[in-house]
């Protein structure tokens, strides 16, 4: 039996974290003999704290050990298990990612150039905005664009957003922007 795939690990781990309202965001496998690593990123609408991560890591480890003893999995000569939340540099790709990062600043890359808010270059249309509300069926996202006098809101279908990455923000967000961020999607003008 070969080293388990990322898909096999994702399915197994989702059964453990799902009942806690968490999702498996990413599984990376680095094969290197006895120094192999299985890196699992989990997250939820309520971000798991370190105690929850530790409990889940122990539970996942026990599950993998039992599955290996039963011949269901084979990690070979050994492996290191890492369980954590996604890093700051992970792209926002799904509705749940935007929902969890509401209020944060991100650089957005669109599938095609937009109006004055995006600077089109050879392949990308990019702009910086604050993540706002999603519509009820989570297919459209409102973003809050900083303005010279007042911020404005623009909405995009999620399938028009190729990628969004969070930006580090050291200052307190402007009140006018946060007011728009906290406005429900259906109440935005």
UniProtKB/Swiss-Prot annotation:
Matching SUPFAM superfamilies: YhbC-like, N-terminal domain
Main location: cytoplasm
UniProt GO BP: ribosomal small subunit assembly; translation
Disulfide bonds: none
Keyword terms, alphabetized: Cytoplasm, Ribosome biogenesis
Organism superkingdom: Bacteria
Gene3D superfamilies membership: RimP-like superfamily, N-terminal (3.30.300.70)
Pfam families: RimP_N
InterPro entries: Ribosome_maturation_RimP, RimP_N, RimP_N_sf
Function: Required for maturation of 30S ribosomal subunits.
UniProt record similarity statement: Belongs to the RimP family.
Protein name (record): Ribosome maturation factor RimP
Organism whose genome encodes this protein: Corynebacterium kroppenstedtii (strain DSM 44385 / JCM 11950 / CIP 105744 / CCUG 35717)
């Amino acid at each position: 039996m070969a080293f388990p795939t990322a898909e096999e690990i994702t399915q197994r781990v989702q059964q453990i974290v799902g009942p806690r309202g968490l999702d498996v965001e990413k599984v990376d496998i680095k094969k290197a003999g006895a120094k192999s690593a299985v890196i699992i990123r989990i997250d939820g609408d309520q971000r798991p704290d370190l105690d929850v991560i530790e409990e889940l890591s122990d539970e996942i480890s026990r599950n993998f050990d039992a599955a290996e003893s039963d011949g269901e999995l084979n990690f070979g000569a050994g492996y290191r298990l890492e369980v954590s939340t996604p890093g700051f540099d992970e792209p926002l790709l799904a509705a749940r990612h935007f929902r969890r990062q509401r209020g944060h600043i991100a650089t957005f890359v669109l599938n095609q150039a937009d109006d004055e808010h995006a600077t089109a270059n050879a392949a990308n249309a990019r702009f910086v905005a604050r993540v706002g509300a999603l519509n009820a069926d989570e297919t459209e996202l409102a973003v809050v664009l900083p303005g010279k006098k007042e911020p404005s809101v623009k909405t995009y279908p999620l399938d028009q957003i190729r990628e969004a990455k969070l930006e580090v923000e050291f200052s307190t967000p402007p009140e006018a922007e946060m007011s728009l961020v906290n406005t429900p999607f259906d109440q935005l003008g």
